[in-house]
Amino acid sequence: MKSLIYGYGITGKSFERYLQKKNLEFDIFDSNISKFKNIEPFEEYDYIYCSPGVPRSVFKLLKTKSNVLTDLDIFFREDASIKIGITGTNRKSTTCFHLYQLFKSQDIVNLIGNIGNPMLDSINNGKKYSIIELSSFQLDKMSVNELDFGILLNIAEDHLDYHGSFEDYKRTKKKVLNSKKFLKTEDPYEIFEWVTGSKAQNQTFKDLPYRYQKVSNSIINDSKSTNMHSLQYAIELANKGLQNKNYVLITCGNPEKERFSKVSLDGPEEVLICGNHRKEISECIQNTNKKIFLNLRKALNHIKHEKNIKNILFSPGYPSGTDSVSYTHLRAHET
């Protein structure tokens, strides 16, 4: 029996470890890695192990050629833990991480999935619960929903380049509601009580990096913000938390995936737009107090010479596109 791993990112490498443990023969294909391009015709493989980020059209093609499996399919089939699936456009990583902290004191939980910890590395590792962060890509490729508990946090327009329409994106996200039990909430305490039947002790949660993270007294790094809804949320937090402390917003990325929607951002003293897509972003952002810079370094140099600016909110609001931002510039900057 011969298998193919399609895609060699985090999930693809976890497929590799999984198949090696089972002593199974396999090839690897990744269009971005030259040494992984020479493979047999797809029909020659008994199984194709497919990563979540593979385009939908390719995934459908592969299914006509062979038996296609995802890491979620395998985890459902082989793992015995109680499975808690969490999805949403925004705050899914944070909610998963906060819920994990409520369980963690008992050492009975996995935190896996889109948050960056591969599912296949946690199969039957003795934990009672598995908190699984689920992206729309994973849900789209999910053949059968075997979640014991499904949580939908929120839905807003995102990944329209993959889904084609907001209606399709919503339909995909709502697949989590076909779980054995489902809930719509963003409250980790409510989720914990719903799953376990007992109340959790109040905690001061640790937060994930790059999600409205204070990296100094004057800089907030929200660089995981890659859609306009998460940017608006960051601005709401800044408007409340930085009262009487003026701040600038730095934004960048590719507005194509937001379909070049027009937006006005209320709160920042200035909006600094930088990166390869700066002109397109400038056409989208309707603020009059905006300035355009070639890159992040030049935007920060501008701030250094503005004595009235006290705080920086770095929240891109768009996927990175062709921008390659070095956040070390941000961390090194003190106002």
Residue map of PLM features:
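Walker A (P-loop) phosphate-binding motif
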Residues: 72, 76-112
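Short, basic phosphate-binding NTP loop
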Residues: 1-85, 211, 282-285, 293-309
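Residue-level signal for inorganic ion chemistry
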Residues: 19, 48, 86, 114, ...
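Flexible active-site lid/hinge loop adjacent to a nucleotide/diphosphate
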Residues: 126-186, 322-327
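Conserved substrate/cofactor phosphate-moiety recognition/catalytic segment
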Residues: 112-124
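C-terminal helical cap/extension that packs against the catalytic core
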Residues: 255-310
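Nucleotide phosphate-binding/pyrophosphate-handling subdomain across enzymes
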Residues: 14-18, 108-109, 187-269
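Conserved small/polar residues in nucleotide/adenosyl-binding loops
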Residues: 328-335
